[in-house]
């Protein structure tokens, strides 16, 4: 919300009560606390496709307060700070959080709505991604093969 207010203000539009906290958006000091902690895990570098936003900023934008859970996962297993695959803008810890918090009904739901991977990568690339299949197994468990064959 704050970023939106800044952009709208740049257009010369005066906002009533721009200092108000947006619904659901944590205070700026919580964001800064997250960014400080995230830098300990080398999340202050950008994804290669998004040079204007660090991994930490991206995680905060996507998850808000829940991003602290991602840091805790990384604290317990640093390998979860790695991207799903080098070209992806989703970290392995996100897959674990998605599996824990969201009701993913299909592989299409995961690839189109939750991660946007289907919108960013060729179908065959995704189909042949071992890492993606492993991520799907975290979410779908015993239903992974059914989900995989249904989507691909």
Predicted regions and their residues:
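C-terminal accessory subdomains/tails of enzymes that are appended
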Residues: 1-152
